[in-house]
Amino acid sequence: MTEIKAVKRLGQHFLRDEGIITQLLAAIDPKPQQKILEIGPGLGALTLPVLERCHELYAVELDHRVLQPLSEKAAAVGILHLIERDILNIHFAEVAPAPIRIIGNLPYNLSSPILFHCVAQRSDIVDMHFMLQKEVVDRITAPVDTPAYGRLSVMIQLYCQVEALFDVPPEAFAPPPKVNSAVVRLIPQTQLTWNIESIAHFECVVRSAFSQRRKMLRKSLAAYFEPKELMALDVDPTARAETIDGASFARLANALYLKEKNL
């Protein structure tokens, strides 16, 4: 394949370490007949070995430069459906038959928007395996009352079972990023982790609490609750967001929903 240099504005870091590719392939464990969609195949380091095992693969790529070389390389391996579009503008069911598995070495500058785009379509998804900045994987998988725990932890864990699989050093990529990477597995759940009346109210409470994470809840949630209301919901008004688990956020969100509904 003709040498193609990574484009910084696209957040490209091409995977090149064969050992890491083998580990990632083992984690994904692609099988024939499975419908798999890859986000950002790039130069095909993961694309081609996955295609070799599942025989047919869907891949969404925004970088026009890689399409023809990748298509030519894949022709001898299996059927590769290349879609030249922005992943954030795609409804997965439009380009690949559901249920689908999603894989990808995600651009670090777009990882959170892509994650939320995926969980919004979770009913069509079997599982997801993503290479991300290690800090993001730590945040996704963080338990309550740990430094990495935050809005991303709560929101992704609401929708998915999460598991950090292994770390990836910078030298596994070309060019090497300035940070460590990691691979995470996300499995959408058929039911939400916590009982929630309104996703919008849950998102609102979680966002407000973590937007001022060093403030006590009586301050960060003052627009919605009096301290006595927090105590009635078994939430300490002097606590900070990082010490509040998902179930407690669900209670707060449900109370806010009922409060506004009865106005």
From Swiss-Prot:
InterPro entries named among the record's database cross-references: KsgA/Erm, rRNA_Ade_diMease-like_C, rRNA_Ade_Mease_Trfase_CS, rRNA_Ade_methylase_Trfase_N, rRNA_adenine_dimethylase, SAM-dependent_MTases_sf
Function: Specifically dimethylates two adjacent adenosines (A1518 and A1519) in the loop of a conserved hairpin near the 3'-end of 16S rRNA in the 30S particle. May play a critical role in biogenesis of 30S subunits.
SUPFAM superfamilies noted in UniProt: S-adenosyl-L-methionine-dependent methyltransferases
Catalytic activity: adenosine(1518)/adenosine(1519) in 16S rRNA + 4 S-adenosyl-L-methionine = N(6)-dimethyladenosine(1518)/N(6)-dimethyladenosine(1519) in 16S rRNA + 4 S-adenosyl-L-homocysteine + 4 H(+)
PROSITE patterns per the UniProt record, alphabetical: RRNA_A_DIMETH, SAM_RNA_A_N6_MT
Gene Ontology molecular function terms on file: 16S rRNA (adenine(1518)-N(6)/adenine(1519)-N(6))-dimethyltransferase activity; RNA binding
Name of this protein: Ribosomal RNA small subunit methyltransferase A
Signal sequence region: none
Enzyme class: transferase
Assigned protein family: Belongs to the class I-like SAM-binding methyltransferase superfamily. rRNA adenine N(6)-methyltransferase family. RsmA subfamily.
Assigned EC number: 2.1.1.182
GO cellular component annotations of the record: cytosol
